[in-house]
């Protein structure tokens, strides 16, 4: 038991919960299976769903992404979950996020909702061991999932979302304290390297809806400068941006993103756009920008605070609810 006491184990068993032990070597997917096995019948009724479950409000749940939503009602911090189960949810989260980023995500969650588990909810979609199973965690500025490759062709198990509001909603131009703002600074370093003609192609006036992250494939034009129009040093800088974007996530997810990207043409089939709309402080450090390919979208909305929408696959023919 995570909490340890034999008396607590007896109480858990009496209420219909299974005791939980976290193996020293485990994946998020295996821990999600343990969480599923630990649930009492009433818990399963509240947070477990069939693989193709269509939510009356959100649609197909396993492909839903949002900036501020809850797939289920019970908060992770609530007494709906046992202490063991809460620790198990945290262990899943910690294995999805690289250790170097745990403190930064904790700061984001403290600022946005009062800390880990406060306002966060969990859904378990499908059945462990069936080949169709997904762990989904949602809340303010969070859509995070893992599925052990249950969803064909898709990175991260499906679209994800992250963001941060340091406080008050409207941040200053330098976004002090925002844990994700360095990603935008990295992208802006690419813009600074562009010459006048390149900047004219990269800078776009019309900002799309932030949740418009459906794939365009090769049928629709994508705004921004083609990566093939970058010089070798500019492209190398863009590679650094991609590495910084992927840095918070576990190795398996980083590799899956790169694999999906390679199978649909790599960075050379992408475009990079910066948006003149929403330039906080009119300092030409572009708060809003987007890296996009036929089936790759990383949309960074920095104004008035950071929202980031991510949708990556190796095929553009995939469903999305955003």
Q: Language-model features: where?
A:
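A cross-kingdom marker for long, charged
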Residues: 22-41, 45-322
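N-terminal export signals
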Residues: 1-19
């Amino acid at each position: 038991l995570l909490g340890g006491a034999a008396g607590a184990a007896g109480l858990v068993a009496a209420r219909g919960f299974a005791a939980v032990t976290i193996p020293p070597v485990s994946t998020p997917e295996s821990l999600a299976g343990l969480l599923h096995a630990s649930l009492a019948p009433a818990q399963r009724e509240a947070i477990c769903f069939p693989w193709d479950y269509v939510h009356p409000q959100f649609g197909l749940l396993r492909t839903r992404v949002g900036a501020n939503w809850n797939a289920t009602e019970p908060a992770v911090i609530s007494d709906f979950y046992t202490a063991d189960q809460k620790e198990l949810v945290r262990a899943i989260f910690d294995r999805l996020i690289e250790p170097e980023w745990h403190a930064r995500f904790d700061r984001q969650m403290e600022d946005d909702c009062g800390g880990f588990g406060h306002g966060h909810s969990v859904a378990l979609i499908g059945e462990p061991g069936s080949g169709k199973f997904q762990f989904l965690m949602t809340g303010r500025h969070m859509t995070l999932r893992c599925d052990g490759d249950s969803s064909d062709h898709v990175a991260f198990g499906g679209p994800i979302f992250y963001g941060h509001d340091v406080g008050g909603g409207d941040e200053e131009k330098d976004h002090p304290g925002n844990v994700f703002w360095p990603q935008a600074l990295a992208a802006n370093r690419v813009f600074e390297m562009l010459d006048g003609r390149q900047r004219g192609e990269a800078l776009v006036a019309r900002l799309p809806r932030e949740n418009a992250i459906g794939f365009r494939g090769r049928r629709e034009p994508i705004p921004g400068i083609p990566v093939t129009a970058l010089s070798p040093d500019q492209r190398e800088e863009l590679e650094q941006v991609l590495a910084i974007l992927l840095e918070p996530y576990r190795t398996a997810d980083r590799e899956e993103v790169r694999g999906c990207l390679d199978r649909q043409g790599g960075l050379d089939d992408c475009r990079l756009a910066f948006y003149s709309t929403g330039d906080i402080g009119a300092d030409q450090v572009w708060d809003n920008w987007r890296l996009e390919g036929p089936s790759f979208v990383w949309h960074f909305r920095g104004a008035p605070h950071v929202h980031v929408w991510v949708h990556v696959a190796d095929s553009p023919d995939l469903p999305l609810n955003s």
